[in-house]
Amino acid sequence: LFLANNLLVCFVRNDGEPALSMAGMIIGSLSNILLDYLFIYPLNLGMVGAALATATAPLISMGILSTHFLRGNSHFRLMKTKPSLSTASSICSLGVSSLITEVSSGIVILVFNFLILDLSGNTGVAAYGVLANIALVLIAISTGIAQGIQPIVSSHPGKKGQPVRHQIRCYALLTALLLALLSYAVIFLLADPIADLFNKDQNTALTSIASDGMRIYFTSLFFSSINIVAAVFLSSTDRPKQAFILSLLRGFLLIIPAAFLLAHLFGLTGIWMSLPVTEGIVCIFS
């Protein structure tokens, strides 16, 4: 259901209805929240209810997105065609950078957990959990901007489309940087209250570690916003190799060695530093 929903979102967005694509995602996500509450508390279904809500949400989103095809607005048509390995590999190559980004995030979280557990124990791991959850939201902002420009950039190929591509890239980078600045300002000023939202037991050590970590860790937003937009822009302009290299540098080649090295040199502070250092280096290549 998740895969089908994400696939449908991309088809609808690239077929000229980004507003419907956005509506499907927003309503599906809000439905997940509302159904979580309904199934867990009033209906008393517990974890089964949470799982049921999570499975139902993409169905709601897909129902909304399917109206694009039911109204006859779609430009996509099913056709008989012979399987082509070269065509399939060309299509897949454009998605490799996104694949690397998604896979690497889980591996990096695992590595960070082991390093932090050794340095600060369970409290440190819990604090990193706070950062990781907030990072999902903040990174989604840049990802949304990058995915939003993809259909426009892809529809203006060649030399004739270069001025439009350049303009869209500038707008996207400027927007991403401004939102990164706003996000970091909120994090910097409200780090303690934000950490307390995840701290039911009022553990002062957890709040201290998480708030200090946020102020260092999320300086990476200024660089990651550029890197994310750059990777999607490269894929959209049929340059998958460059996009792959950027994603590989961000996902594996730099972040993990940097985490081990900086953790050895600066302890827990070094781990928080490893992400902005990595994103900053990759930004040079972007």
Residue ranges: model-predicted function:
Residues 2-21, 128-185, 189-191, 224-243:
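Small-residue-rich hydrophobic transmembrane alpha-helices
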